[in-house]
């Protein structure tokens, strides 16, 4: 499945706009608290284990969105947006959304 942040796919014609699709993943409070309170594993100015957790959450949200698009008969998603939000009790939510299309 093609997934892009752009409104179209170069060299491809969008045959049908199907629906808005999304996916979410929430990281536990202890991870978020540790993320902002401690950087014990910082290497070269980056916190590797936290980046790994954020990537994992983003991948889960993206997979959820792609599965929803597939269920709706789409073979691509355009206009994808990724948001990170701190929600109640210090939990972090990764939310992705886009438009499911058929090319």
UniProtKB/Swiss-Prot annotation:
<dbReference type="InterPro" id="IPR035439">
    <property type="entry name" value="UPF0145_dom_sf"/>
</dbReference>
<comment type="similarity">
    <text>Belongs to the UPF0145 family.</text>
</comment>
<dbReference type="Pfam" id="PF01906">
    <property type="entry name" value="YbjQ_1"/>
</dbReference>
<protein>
    <recommendedName>
        <fullName>UPF0145 protein BC_1012</fullName>
    </recommendedName>
</protein>
<dbReference type="InterPro" id="IPR002765">
    <property type="entry name" value="UPF0145_YbjQ-like"/>
</dbReference>
């Amino acid at each position: 499945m093609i997934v892009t942040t752009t409104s179209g796919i170069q060299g491809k014609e969008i045959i049908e706009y199907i629906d808005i699709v999304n996916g979410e993943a929430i990281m536990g409070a202890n991870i978020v608290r540790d993320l902002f309170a401690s950087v014990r594993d910082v290497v070269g100015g980056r916190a590797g284990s936290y980046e790994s957790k954020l990537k994992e959450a983003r991948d889960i949200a993206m997979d959820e969105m792609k599965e929803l698009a597939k269920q709706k008969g789409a073979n691509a998603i355009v206009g994808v947006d990724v948001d990170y939000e701190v929600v109640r009790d210090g939990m972090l939510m990764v939310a992705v959304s886009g438009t499911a299309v058929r090319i």
